[in-house]
Every structure is written in structure tokens, then in C-alpha cells.
């Protein structure tokens, strides 16, 4: 082995920030990008405009923040760690970039979000799923988001029907947005290095969003992906599934003041609806977003709803 050179501490205003002097809390997902080339690539792929207001989550020591401030109109950085807040402010203090930076302290999942055009973030991995959900339900919709995730999570976001990573998450996100893998990032590009590699994904919300009752949509997908390799007919013949659907059916009929047939056979109604829809022998792992939309419509026409 060759000699290991000593790592020099860098000043807070340098291109990499004062990362050596700050202890990082990896339990909170604090892993700082140390490679300027990767930081520059993320900013380049973000295609920011000079008029953009950018929402950044978890700026850390500000490596990505500073580069975005050089391009965008404003960067609103949301950070929960007071030490990191002080560090990112120090990076731009006394420079022309200072007036372009706004730092919001606190938990980004609990705070009210400001208006922003684009979201660019190296996200704490623990909040990946709830953050994406909040992003896609935020109004007004941003133009897009460029987000760093654990590679395993990113693979699920971009998975297509038939892929091993295709899941309820894939369908939910792809209903509301166009998703694209932009680049992969090795774990060694971070300090301290996480246990797994990462990936950068572009999420562009569909605007306007599809006219879907998301409570029902989520209820349907939850059932379909109970056993994503089984046929839908096999899943919807399960007694506990039939029981839930019949309970919802009775609630809907009561709400509509519609009489419930005395000889109601919910299993038969479900089987006939699935057969007529053409999806009875389909498996969730191979169904497209459009297929689930058509299936939900077929069920709704038969007064079958997914309320819980």
C-alpha cells in the first residue's frame, strides 16, 4: 500500500466546505457530497434558470447550495441541524450570494413549504418516500425535482412493468409524474460514506394531475400489490378482500340511497367485473398505470369503491 496522505481541513468558504471540523450524524442521513465533479453534474442536470427559486432540503455544509446560488435567483435551504445552518450561512457571508440565500430551520416534513420552481436536494434517506408524496401533492406544482436517493429506492421509482423492482411506489409516483434516472453516485463520493450507493432522479409532476380519487387509487393498489405475482382474480377471491369490498359497497349504496340486493353475492359481482374488464388474469407486477386506471373505472361502474 502507498502512503496515506493527511487530509487538510478546508475553510468554510472553500469549494468543499468545512466538512472535516463538523461531526456528522449519519443516523439523520448526514452524508456530504465531497466530489465537486458530482456536485457540478447535479447542478448541470438540474438545468436551472436565472429566474428560478429553488427548494433545497438538507444543504449540509453548502457544497450544492453554493453552486445553485451561482445560477438561480434564490435558494431556499431547509435544514434541521443548527450546526449546518450556521455552516451554510458562513459559506456565503459577505459575498454577492448572501442575499440570494434563505435558510429555513426545522423539519421539512412538518413545515409549510414556500413557493418554489424547482427542488434540488441530496435528501436524507429516511424521508425519501414521505418527501416524494408531499412533493407531488404540493400546490402549486413545481416544474420538476432533481433528487438524490439510495439507489435501491431510485430503482423502485423508475421501475417499469415486469421489472423486479416494480412496486406500488412505482405506480403511485408514475401516475402523478414522469420519472427519469439521471445518474448514479458511488458511496465513496460522500463523507462519511453511506453503506450503499446513491442515484439522482428527475421527477416532473404532471400538470394538471390526473383526475383520480387518490384515496380510492391507493386502496386499489394496496390490494393489487398484496401479492404482486398472483392474478388479480386470485387476490380478489380472498375472503378478507371480499369482506372489505362488500362493506364499502354497502356504505356507497347507503350514501346514494340505493337499495342493496337481498341476494347480494359480492364474490360473484367482483368476479364478473374483473372478467368483463379483461384484467382477471393480470398480475400487478406487469400492469401499467393505464391498466390500473381502467380497472378502477370498471370497479367504480359496478359501485365497487376502495374507501379504506
From Swiss-Prot:
PROSITE patterns: RRNA_A_DIMETH, SAM_RNA_A_N6_MT. GO terms for cellular component: nucleolus; small-subunit processome. Residues 1-11 have a biased composition (Basic residues). SMART domains: rADc. Keywords: Methyltransferase, Nucleus, RNA-binding, rRNA processing, S-adenosyl-L-methionine, Transferase. It is found in: Nucleus, Nucleolus. Residues 1-24 are annotated as: Disordered. Its EC number is 2.1.1.183. The keyword Transferase applies. S-adenosyl-L-methionine binds at residues 31, 33, 58, 79, 107, 122. The keyword rRNA processing applies. GO terms for biological process: ribosomal small subunit biogenesis; rRNA methylation. Pfam families: RrnaAD. Residues 12-24 have a biased composition (Polar residues). Its main location: nucleus. It is an enzyme of class 2 (transferase). It catalyses: adenosine(1779)/adenosine(1780) in 18S rRNA + 4 S-adenosyl-L-methionine = N(6)-dimethyladenosine(1779)/N(6)-dimethyladenosine(1780) in 18S rRNA + 4 S-adenosyl-L-homocysteine + 4 H(+). It comes from the Eukaryota. One of its GO terms (molecular function) is rRNA (adenine-N6,N6-)-dimethyltransferase activity. Specifically dimethylates two adjacent adenosines in the loop of a conserved hairpin near the 3'-end of 18S rRNA in the 40S particle. Involved in the pre-rRNA processing steps leading to small-subunit rRNA production independently of its RNA-modifying catalytic activity. Part of the small subunit (SSU) processome, first precursor of the small eukaryotic ribosomal subunit. Part of the small subunit (SSU) processome, composed of more than 70 proteins and the RNA chaperone small nucleolar RNA (snoRNA) U3. Belongs to the class I-like SAM-binding methyltransferase superfamily. rRNA adenine N(6)-methyltransferase family. This is Probable dimethyladenosine transferase. It comes from Caenorhabditis elegans.
Amino acid at each position: 500500500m502507498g502512503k496515506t496522505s493527511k487530509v487538510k481541513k478546508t475553510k468554510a468558504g472553500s469549494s468543499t466546505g468545512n466538512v472535516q471540523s463538523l461531526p456528522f450524524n449519519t443516523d439523520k442521513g448526514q452524508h456530504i457530497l465531497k466530489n465537486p465533479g458530482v456536485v457540478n453534474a447535479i447542478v448541470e442536470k438540474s438545468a436551472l434558470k436565472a429566474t428560478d427559486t429553488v427548494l433545497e432540503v438538507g444543504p449540509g455544509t453548502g457544497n450544492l447550495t453554493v453552486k445553485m446560488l451561482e445560477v438561480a435567483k434564490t435558494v431556499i435551504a431547509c435544514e434541521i441541524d443548527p450546526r449546518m445552518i450556521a455552516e451554510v450561512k458562513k459559506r456565503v457571508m459577505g459575498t454577492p450570494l448572501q442575499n440570494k440565500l434563505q435558510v429555513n430551520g426545522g423539519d421539512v416534513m412538518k413545515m409549510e413549504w414556500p413557493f418554489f420552481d424547482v427542488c434540488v436536494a441530496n435528501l436524507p434517506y429516511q424521508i425519501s418516500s414521505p418527501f416524494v408524496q408531499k412533493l407531488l401533492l404540493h400546490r402549486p406544482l413545481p416544474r420538476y425535482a432533481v433528487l438524490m436517493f439510495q439507489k435501491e429506492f431510485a430503482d423502485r421509482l423508475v421501475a417499469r412493468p415486469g421489472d423486479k423492482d416494480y412496486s406500488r411506489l412505482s405506480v403511485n409516483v408514475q401516475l402523478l409524474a414522469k420519472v427519469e434516472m439521471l445518474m448514479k453516485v458511488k458511496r465513496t463520493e460522500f463523507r462519511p460514506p453511506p453503506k450503499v450507493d446513491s442515484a439522482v432522479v428527475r421527477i416532473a409532476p404532471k400538470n394538471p394531475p390526473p383526475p383520480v380519487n387518490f384515496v380510492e387509487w391507493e386502496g386499489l393498489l394496496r390490494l393489487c400489490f398484496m401479492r404482486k405475482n398472483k392474478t388479480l382474480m386470485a387476490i380478489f377471491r380472498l375472503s378478507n378482500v371480499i369482506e372489505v369490498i362488500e362493506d364499502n359497497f354497502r356504505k356507497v349504496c347507503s350514501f346514494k340511497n340505493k337499495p342493496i340486493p337481498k341476494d347480494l353475492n359480492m364474490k360473484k359481482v367482483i368476479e364478473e367485473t374483473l372478467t368483463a374488464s379483461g384484467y382477471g388474469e393480470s398480475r400487478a407486477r406487469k400492469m401499467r398505470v393505464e391498466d390500473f386506471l381502467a380497472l378502477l373505472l370498471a370497479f367504480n361502474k359496478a359501485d365497487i369503491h376502495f374507501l379504506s
